[in-house]
Amino acid sequence: MLDIKKIKEILPHRYPFLLVDRVISVEEGKKVTAIKNVTANEEFFNGHFPEYPVMPGVLIVEALAQTSGIAMMQSEANKGKIGLFAGIDGCRFKRQVIPGDQLLLEAEITRMRGAIAKAKVKATVEGDLVCEAEIMFALSDLPK
């Protein structure tokens, strides 16, 4: 399990764009399960939509990408790198995410060859599928 302090040591993202609150399980270099607690105080609900707050799908995908980044950085060979979003395939949304929901984020690295990685990802709320996709990343060194 990784708390927010450990997550910030791995990911360069910060408020308001850090979308992973806690990592609840890790299979080193392979799979990560994390959570994002969606509260009524999220900045994006001010405009999406004030009378009917729904988490933007692109931010659900970003939370999944960040979870994938944590999975990739668990490999010793990738320490000090960043996974840059390079593509997405088969993305489907099945359920809305609203204030009070807890997103369960799962990312499994399916391919890591050179500087390219792929992850199969899915987000659920209370067991209901929210989103699934395959995300591709280009690994790059973090600037010093």
From Swiss-Prot:
SUPFAM superfamilies: Thioesterase/thiol ester dehydrase-isomerase (SSF54637). Coiled coil: none annotated. The active site is at residue 48. GO terms for biological process: fatty acid biosynthetic process; lipid A biosynthetic process. Keywords: Cytoplasm, Lipid A biosynthesis, Lipid biosynthesis, Lipid metabolism, Lyase. The keyword Lipid biosynthesis applies. Pfam families: FabA. The gene is fabZ. Belongs to the thioester dehydratase family. FabZ subfamily. Its EC number is 4.2.1.59. Involved in unsaturated fatty acids biosynthesis. Catalyzes the dehydration of short chain beta-hydroxyacyl-ACPs and long chain saturated and unsaturated beta-hydroxyacyl-ACPs. It comes from Listeria welshimeri serovar 6b (strain ATCC 35897 / DSM 20650 / CCUG 15529 / CIP 8149 / NCTC 11857 / SLCC 5334 / V8). This is 3-hydroxyacyl-[acyl-carrier-protein] dehydratase FabZ. It is found in: Cytoplasm. GO terms for cellular component: cytoplasm; membrane. Its main location: cytoplasm. GO terms for molecular function: (3R)-hydroxyacyl-[acyl-carrier-protein] dehydratase activity. It catalyses: a (3R)-hydroxyacyl-[ACP] = a (2E)-enoyl-[ACP] + H2O. HAMAP family: FabZ (MF_00406).
